[in-house]
């Protein structure tokens, strides 16, 4: 049984609408999601003693989500991740996007899908959000109808993304939740044990755009096929953290891609997806300046993201998995976040 409770989270300035909160509860999980950016604001998971803690970074109030923040919990699009120099060419026409991350376009631009109000529809076991992204929004071609559905089933949070386009456009949707399985507000994620089921990753340039090479993980810091304790692993390889796409099988079938275990609490997160990639990000740009829920501060490496996705900058790399959605087709991807204790 899943209960869905609806409440007001806050009002947007200048009468631009009311943001609602939807609380989904199963016997194992409780998830709060708001209609601003389809954002997960809280996710309570029990530890091995049966004590529940909120394991996602975020804020208590709407005003904080309206200020600049690193996409805590939000759905990002029309194209998640980076597009080099904010440009791409389709059918001989060059499109110029908003530049909002160094020389590149990141997560859909200045006002991406994380910074808009979505229309909610309550389901028996979750919530569906929808919106229409108009032709030309943030420089992208064509009107795009989008649906994001969150459902609960026991210890599983399932996120489904669907989209239909009026003209050919790149589409790549993901959720940008930051997790800390010790509980949000814990100072770091160094004691988390991470596994990523990927034989290859994408090396990046200094602006975090993939170079185009598909590199084997074997013998590198990116070989996470067997569990590694994150803090020790970063030290051993002298790296600042991860912010890279790991290459999964291009099957479109549900596949296991990542597992994170926090030994102290016993909490385990496993991720399954139909997507061909997953961005593992270790909160390298968090700096402790943002004040989160319950007075928490979020310093560097205090949360991790597992963003299932198409490969970054795929629109400019013909040998990457196809990212273009054509009229008459449907974009349809699902990601499963499965929580348990061990």
From Swiss-Prot:
Phosphoserine PTM positions: 14, 124
Biological pathway: Carbohydrate metabolism; hexose metabolism; Carbohydrate metabolism; galactose metabolism
One Pfam family matching this protein: Aldose_epim
Gene3D superfamilies xrefs: 2.70.98.10
CDD domains, per the entry: galactose_mutarotase_like
Record field: catalytic activity: alpha-D-galactose = beta-D-galactose; alpha-D-glucose = beta-D-glucose
One Gene Ontology CC term in the entry: cytoplasm
Keywords associated with the record: Carbohydrate metabolism, Cytoplasm, Isomerase, Phosphoprotein
Signal peptide residues on this chain, from the entry's feature table: none
InterPro entries referenced in this protein's UniProt entry, alphabetically: Ald1_epimerase_CS (IPR018052), Aldose_1-epimerase (IPR015443), Aldose_1/G6P_1-epimerase (IPR008183), Gal_mutarotase_sf_dom (IPR011013), Galactose_mutarotase-like (IPR047215), GH-type_carb-bd (IPR014718)
Gene Ontology biological process terms, A to Z: galactose catabolic process via UDP-galactose, Leloir pathway; glucose metabolic process
Active site: 176, 307
Subcellular compartments: Cytoplasm
Class in the EC hierarchy, top level: isomerase
Taxonomic superkingdom: Eukaryota
Role of this protein: Mutarotase that catalyzes the interconversion of beta-D-galactose and alpha-D-galactose during galactose metabolism. Beta-D-galactose is metabolized in the liver into glucose 1-phosphate, the primary metabolic fuel, by the action of four enzymes that constitute the Leloir pathway: GALM, GALK1 (galactokinase), GALT (galactose-1-phosphate uridylyltransferase) and GALE (UDP-galactose-4'-epimerase). Involved in the maintenance of the equilibrium between the beta- and alpha-anomers of galactose, therefore ensuring a sufficient supply of the alpha-anomer for GALK1.
Subunit and interaction comment: Monomer.
Similarity comment text for this entry: Belongs to the aldose epimerase family.
Name used for this protein in its record: Galactose mutarotase
Source organism per UniProt: Sus scrofa (Pig)
């Amino acid at each position: 049984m899943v209960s869905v409770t609806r409440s007001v989270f806050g009002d947007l300035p200048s009468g631009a609408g009311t943001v609602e909160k939807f609380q989904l509860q199963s016997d194992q999980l409780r998830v709060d999601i708001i209609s601003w950016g389809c954002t997960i604001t809280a996710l309570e998971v029990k530890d091995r003693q049966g004590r529940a803690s909120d394991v996602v970074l975020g804020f208590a109030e709407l005003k904080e989500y309206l200020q600049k923040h690193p996409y805590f919990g939000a759905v990002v699009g029309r194209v998640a991740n980076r597009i080099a120099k904010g440009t791409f060419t389709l059918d001989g026409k060059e499109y110029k996007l908003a530049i909002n991350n160094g020389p590149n376009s990141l997560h859909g631009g200045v006002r991406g899908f994380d910074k808009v109000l979505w229309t909610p529809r309550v389901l028996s076991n979750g919530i569906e959000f929808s919106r229409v992204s108009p032709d030309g929004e943030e420089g992208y071609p064509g009107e795009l109808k989008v649906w994001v559905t969150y459902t609960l089933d026991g210890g599983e949070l399932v996120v489904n993304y669907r989209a239909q386009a009026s003209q050919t456009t790149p589409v790549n949707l993901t959720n940008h939740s930051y997790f800390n399985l010790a509980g949000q507000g814990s100072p770091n994620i160094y004691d988390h044990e991470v596994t990523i089921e990927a034989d290859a990753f994408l090396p990046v340039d200094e602006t975090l755009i993939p170079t185009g090479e598909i590199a084997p993980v074997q013998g590198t810091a990116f070989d996470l096929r067997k569990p590694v304790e994150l803090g020790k692993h970063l030290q051993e390889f002298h790296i600042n953290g991860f912010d890279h796409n790991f290459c999964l099988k291009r099957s479109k079938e549900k596949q296991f891609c990542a597992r994170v275990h926090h030994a102290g609490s016993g909490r385990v997160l496993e991720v399954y997806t139909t997507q061909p990639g997953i961005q593992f990000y270790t909160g390298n740009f968090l700096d402790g300046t943002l004040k989160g829920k319950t007075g928490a501060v979020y310093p560097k490496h205090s949360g991790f993201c597992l963003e299932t996705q198409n490969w970054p900058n795929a629109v400019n790399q013909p040998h990457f998995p196809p990212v273009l959605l054509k009229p008459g087709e449907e974009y349809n991807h699902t990601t499963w976040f499965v929580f348990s204790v061990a």
